[in-house]
């Protein structure tokens, strides 16, 4: 049976050929290997039909042009040569599109990313819709790759090298007006007239080459290019610590093409694509992509979700304000905030207003849209209107009696359908539900701060939580733009439990005399976005350490921090960035906030003159191995449902280095035997807290892995 083509060609009366892209049976258009022959067939038709005056590519999908290449194509490659051949095939198809003698225009609505933008770049002109869904970018670097179908050569020549590098090295996506300003598109029009505008552009003949700004022309010259690549190279090295080889290869490939011409650039691009596709960093980053994609489809429970029409939030503090914002502004759901004080409600409303107003100032949101979203959020000091709320999210103080009272009151004033979701970070959900009349509708929903930025939520059912409750709250989290993982109702849940030993070990290194910045820099070099001590400052020392006694009580001495260190810091009123003094001092100059280690911390903790005695590798090893050992325990105790969930939880929740794929993929890469051996060596040097858990010893003996063998390469 013939495969249904994703490309349909129709020639209009005005002799403009419209190629409609519609991948059969798919919500998103993604470029697949078999599409190559389909496009080539259309190009042959266009060459043969001399009456055709121009071509327009447009998508039949509701919200995407082409969202990129099908990543599974790369996963199926077993060598750099296979991946290089894949890139060359893409380059050849784009060259054939660009080589047509008649004007070819891309009419873009929705996501135009990766291979989709490379196809648009191969066209002679581009028009996009002014819709909020329209985004243009080359995000391959986020998968440890580079654009492999000509993007590294065409983009710099179209918009200038510095702007192109910014897009490719960061994966930044441009909105319609940004794309127009950059010269990436020729026009921005309402979606309703997108096709007509593209046809009119095609009828005018090939668009004339856009003049690149003077600054970009200077940077494209030999001297300017040398200085630019030298500067950007140093900047990216500082940001990536050399952990992401794709950024270095992007710089090399772009520079090669500018210095030696497109032919050399295309050859180098394909070669680099092949190398990067086989790199462990890209394989790890692609595993994160596949895992997060799987989680988006995971309903969380076998039951179907209940209705989800409106939500309430208890508490107008930092977390409550953030939860209200993502519920209304990301999820589009009406939210009512309850606080005992009007100022708490006002604080939460201001939180959303400030975030929305910032988007208005940045021209990412129209004032009328800001006002519409704000209208979804209301406040109350009583339970008026709670009978109609499907989910009530509690974000009050970490006090068990208070949370139990909240459950009782919500059951009294809410409807029979109302779910109670607690944002606790430390209290057992079973205890919170202990006196509930409808315990099946009580669940934990642990957000991370700041709520609007952190992508993860932990979903914590207790033993009596109904499957429908789980499914409903998972659906809510997805509407809020979050990635939910379901974790067991045990002390610390998952993320805080693996984070605490890591933080504690950093504190021990500090007490031993390692300077604050040396510890943090070592973990940044390892691949974390910030070091453990700075992380504590960012979260808030008072907030971040509340979980430690809970974990110490549940699991014993291995969770004990160095004696009195936290008490001494808190008694000196050091809370971190929020009061401008923690382990670091913070000062704001203009729009920039600067931090520096506070030397007064050392005498406060009874530390003499700090002096670095360990290498960055030794510092990182001690902190990371404590985290890995605890993650293995969580896996064994079924705190997480799978290695997939554990990796996503660590990467999205605490910034575990994505290029390592998460703690479980990292342990699989180096081997359970090696992890156990390192822990045994550290235990002999520093004490029994490093003793490898039984799970690691058993896996080392059996030669098994956390990830199933058939999932390790996807």
From Swiss-Prot:
The UniProt record lists the keyword Ribosomal protein: no
Sites annotated Important for catalytic activity: 118, 140
UniProt keyword Lyase present: yes
Region (3-hydroxyacyl-CoA dehydrogenase): 306-714
Key words, A-Z: Cytoplasm, Fatty acid metabolism, Isomerase, Lipid degradation, Lipid metabolism, Lyase, Multifunctional enzyme, NAD, Oxidoreductase
A GO term from the CC aspect: cytoplasm
GO terms, biological process: fatty acid beta-oxidation
PROSITE patterns: 3HCDH
UniProt GO molecular function: 3-hydroxybutyryl-CoA epimerase activity; enoyl-CoA hydratase activity; long-chain-3-hydroxyacyl-CoA dehydrogenase activity; NAD+ binding
Top-rank taxon: Bacteria
Assigned EC number: 4.2.1.17, 5.1.2.3, 1.1.1.35
Compartment annotation: Cytoplasm
Catalysed reactions listed for this entry: a (3S)-3-hydroxyacyl-CoA = a (2E)-enoyl-CoA + H2O; a 4-saturated-(3S)-3-hydroxyacyl-CoA = a (3E)-enoyl-CoA + H2O; a (3S)-3-hydroxyacyl-CoA + NAD(+) = a 3-oxoacyl-CoA + NADH + H(+); (3S)-3-hydroxybutanoyl-CoA = (3R)-3-hydroxybutanoyl-CoA
CDD domains: crotonase-like
HAMAP family: FadJ
Family listed: In the N-terminal section; belongs to the enoyl-CoA hydratase/isomerase family.
Function: Catalyzes the formation of a hydroxyacyl-CoA by addition of water on enoyl-CoA. Also exhibits 3-hydroxyacyl-CoA epimerase and 3-hydroxyacyl-CoA dehydrogenase activities.
Name of the protein described by the UniProt record: Fatty acid oxidation complex subunit alpha
Species of provenance: Klebsiella pneumoniae subsp. pneumoniae (strain ATCC 700721 / MGH 78578)
Source organism phylogeny: Bacteria, Pseudomonadati, Pseudomonadota, Gammaproteobacteria, Enterobacterales
């Amino acid at each position: 049976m013939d495969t249904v083509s994703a490309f349909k060609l129709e020639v209009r009366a005005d002799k403009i050929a419209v190629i409609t892209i519609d991948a059969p049976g798919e919500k998103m258009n993604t470029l697949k290997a078999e599409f190559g022959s389909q496009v080539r067939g259309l190009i042959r038709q266009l060459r043969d039909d001399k009456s055709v005056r121009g071509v327009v590519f447009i998508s039949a999908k509701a919200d995407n042009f082409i969202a990129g290449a099908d990543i599974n194509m790369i996963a199926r490659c077993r060598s750099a040569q296979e991946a290089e051949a894949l890139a060359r095939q893409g380059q050849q198809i784009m060259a054939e599109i660009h080589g047509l003698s008649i004007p070819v225009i891309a009419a873009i609505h929705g996501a135009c990313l990766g291979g989709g933008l490379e196809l648009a770049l191969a066209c002679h002109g581009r028009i996009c819709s002014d819709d909020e869904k329209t985004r243009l970018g080359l995000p391959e670097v986020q998968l440890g790759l580079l654009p492999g179908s000509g993007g590294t050569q065409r983009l710099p020549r179209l918009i200038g090298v510095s702007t192109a590098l910014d897009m490719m090295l960061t994966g930044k996506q441009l909105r319609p007006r940004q794309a127009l300003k950059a010269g990436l598109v020729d026009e921005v029009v309402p979606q309703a007239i997108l096709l007509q505008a593209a046809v009119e552009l095609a009828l005018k003949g090939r668009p004339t080459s856009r003049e690149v700004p003077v600054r970009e022309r200077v940077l494209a010259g030999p001297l300017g290019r040398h200085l630019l690549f030298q500067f950007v190279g140093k900047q990216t090295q500082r940001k990536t610590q050399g952990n992401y080889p794709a950024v270095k290869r992007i710089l090399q490939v772009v520079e090669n093409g500018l210095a030696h011409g497109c032919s050399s650039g295309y050859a180098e691009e394909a070669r680099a694509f092949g190398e990067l596709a086989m790199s462990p960093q890209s394989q790890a980053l692609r595993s994160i992509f596949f895992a997060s994609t799987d989680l988006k489809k995971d309903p969380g429970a076998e039951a179907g979700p209940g209705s989800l029409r409106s939500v309430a939030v208890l508490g107008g503090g930092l977390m409550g304000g953030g939860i209200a914002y993502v519920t209304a502004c990301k999820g589009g759901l009406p939210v009512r905030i309850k606080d005992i004080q009007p100022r708490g409600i006002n604080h939460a409303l201001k939180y959303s207003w400030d975030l929305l107003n910032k988007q208005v100032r940045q021209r990412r949101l129209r004032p009328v849209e800001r006002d519409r979203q704000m209208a979804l959020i209301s406040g109350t000091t009583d339970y008026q209107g709670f009978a109609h709320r499907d989910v009530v999210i509690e974000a009050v103080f970490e006090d068990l009696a208070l949370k139990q009272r909240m459950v009782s009151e919500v059951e009294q004033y809410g409807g029979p359908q109302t779910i109670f979701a607690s944002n606790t970070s430390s209290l057992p959900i079973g205890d919170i539900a202990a006196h509930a009349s409808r315990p099946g509708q009580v669940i934990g929903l642990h957000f991370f701060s700041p709520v609007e930025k952190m992508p993860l939520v932990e979903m914590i059912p207790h033993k009596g939580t109904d499957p429908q409750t789980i499914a409903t709250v998972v659906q809510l989290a997805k509407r809020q733009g979050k990635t939910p993982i379901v974790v067991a109702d045990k002390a610390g849940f998952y993320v805080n439990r693996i984070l605490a030993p890591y933080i504690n070990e950093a504190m021990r290194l500090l007490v031993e005399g390692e300077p604050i910045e040396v510890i943090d820099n070592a973990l940044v070099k390892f691949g974390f976005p910030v070091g453990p001590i700075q992380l504590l400052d960012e979260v808030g020392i008072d907030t971040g350490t509340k979980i430690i006694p809970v974990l110490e009580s549940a699991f014993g001495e291995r969770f004990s921090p160095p004696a009195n260190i936290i008490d001494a810091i808190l008694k000196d009123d050091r809370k971190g960035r929020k009061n401008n003094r923690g382990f670091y001092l913070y000062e704001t100059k203009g729009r920039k906030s600067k931090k520096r280690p506070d030397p007064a911390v050392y005498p406060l903790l009874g530390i003499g003159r700090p002096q670095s005695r360990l290498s960055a590798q030794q510092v990182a090893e001690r902190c990371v191995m404590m985290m890995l050992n605890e993650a293995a325990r969580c896996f064994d105790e079924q705190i997480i449902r799978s290695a997939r969930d554990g990796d996503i939880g660590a990467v999205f929740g605490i910034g575990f280095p994505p290029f390592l794929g998460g703690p479980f993929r990292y342990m699989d890469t180096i081997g359970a035997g090696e992890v156990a051996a390192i822990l045994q060596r550290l235990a002999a040097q520093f004490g029994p807290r490093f003793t490898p858990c039984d799970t690691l010893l058993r896996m080392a003996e059996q030669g098994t892995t956390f990830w199933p063998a058939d999932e390790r390469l996807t």
